[in-house]
Curated annotation (Swiss-Prot):
Source organism per UniProt: Vibrio cholerae serotype O1 (strain ATCC 39315 / El Tor Inaba N16961)
InterPro entries: GrpB/CoaE, NT_sf
Pfam families per record: GrpB
Protein name in UniProt: UPF0157 protein VC_A0354
Domain of life: Bacteria
UniProt record similarity statement: Belongs to the UPF0157 (GrpB) family.
Length: 188
């Protein structure tokens, strides 16, 4: 995995700091609001299990990972669900087409590369798929999750950061979170 600078987080999505990847930051209008783990994690896990089965039926060779804050025990979150769908790079476009049959559309105003496509739920559920080419730099979604899962102190610091951003704009929140994410991903 490439470790060029890491930055912004949008709907739980970590993006690289280099200029083309900054486009992956979405534009959201409302101020930040967060929920304690016991207020959202069980429902996100149930929703993840539902989509995991549906994705596996469409893409039996895909790796399917619950990522984002809702996948980290005891983490404060916006209550959204992010799912990484890892596929062979040559099959990414076909995977995107198949996943769209589950009611997902390609996310506009965000990064789109041959190795990454972000899909959002079109029915109003706060669920996103990150369709990622296996072996690409975009597998860092899983790395960030795993680092926090292994370190309760990092989760506590992440929670404190998020709570301190309550009422902030999404832009301000992403800036503050970017520095934290960059530090976490830079740790050995």
């Amino acid at each position: 995995m490439s470790r060029g600078g890491f930055g912004g987080l949008c709907l739980g999505l970590v993006v690289m700091r280099c200029q083309p990847l900054r486009r992956a930051l979405c534009l959201l209008g409302d101020n930040m609001q967060f929920y304690k783990a016991d207020e959202y994690q069980a429902s996100c896990e149930n929703l993840y299990r539902k989509y995991e089965l549906e994705i596996a039926a469409l893409l039996p060779d895909a790796s399917i990972e619950h990522i984002g804050t809702s996948s980290i025990p005891n983490a404060v979150s916006k209550g959204d669900l992010d799912i990484l769908v890892g596929v062979n790079g040559k099959e990414l476009e076909n995977a995107v087409k198949l996943l769209s049959t589950l009611g997902f559309n390609e996310k506009s105003d965000t990064l789109r590369t041959p190795e990454l496509c972000m899909l959002e739920n079109s029915s109003g559920e706060d669920v996103a798929f990150q369709v990622v080419a296996n072996g690409s730099e975009f597998e860092f979604f899983v790395g960030f999750r795993d680092k926090l899962r292994k370190n309760p102190e990092l989760v506590q610091r992440y929670n404190e950061l998020k709570i301190s951003c309550t009422g902030w704009s999404h832009e301000e929140y992403r800036r503050k979170k970017s520095a934290f994410i960059e530090r976490v991903l830079g740790q050995a």
